[in-house]
């Protein structure tokens, strides 16, 4: 992954977006934003992710963005210190979403900018994520934000939950 430098100080296109730590009150809005993008509601998934993020409050890296006082987007990330045979601290971007009314208003960019700042302060050297190979809009967004293909291969193994041997 390339290390994209932060913009020079001054007026940024993300300045109208307030980015803050995610909290329990954000759950329903996060679920609703994700449901529009994914086509399904995943309240339990986000409840578990939010509970984990709040419990790790000292290392909170999950954020929401507000535009005009309303939650307009979110990013959920996790920290890893040596898992999967990687010696340096890394982070995983687990989920990101922007309300459809706020797309094109640099909300996602503001979220990633703040996430990068937070992770850099924690001395995290790499941010990783996974994207469906046919989600071209998200792939284009991540490319624009400096993500490149990783030198790792994600593997799947189909399991049969009805088979007990």
What does each model-found stretch correspond to?
Residues 12-13, 17, 21-25, 32-88, ...:
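Acetyl-CoA-dependent GNAT
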Residues 1-12, 130, 143-165:
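Terminal substrate-recognition subdomain of acyl/acetyltransferases
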Residues 84-88, 106, 133:
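Residues at secondary-structure transition points
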Residues 98, 104-117, 144:
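Conserved acetyl-CoA-binding loop-helix of GNAT-fold acetyltransferases
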Residues 119-131:
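Conserved GNAT acetyl-CoA-binding A-motif
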Residues 109, 121, 133-151:
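Conserved active-site alpha-helix within GNAT-family acetyltransferase domains
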Residues 40, 105, 136:
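Loop/helix-junction capping segments adjacent to catalytic residues or to phosphate/diphosphate-binding pockets
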């Amino acid at each position: 992954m390339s290390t994209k430098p932060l913009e020079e100080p001054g007026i940024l296109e993300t300045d109208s977006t307030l980015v803050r730590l995610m909290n329990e009150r954000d759950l329903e809005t996060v679920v609703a934003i994700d449901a529009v993008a994914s086509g399904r509601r995943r309240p339990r998934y986000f409840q578990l992710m939010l509970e984990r993020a709040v419990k790790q409050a000292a290392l909170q890296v999950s954020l929401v963005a507000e535009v005009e006082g309303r939650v307009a987007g979110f990013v959920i990330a996790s920290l890893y210190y040596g898992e999967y045979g990687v010696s340096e601290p890394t982070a995983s971007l687990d989920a990101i979403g922007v309300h459809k009314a706020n797309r094109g208003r640099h909300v996602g960019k503001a979220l990633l900018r703040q996430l990068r700042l937070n992770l850099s302060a924690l001395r995290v050297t790499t941010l990783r994520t996974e994207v469906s190979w046919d989600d071209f809009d998200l792939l284009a967004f991540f490319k624009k934000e400096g993500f490149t293909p990783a030198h790792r291969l994600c593997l799947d193994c189909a399991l049969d939950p009805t088979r007990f041997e």
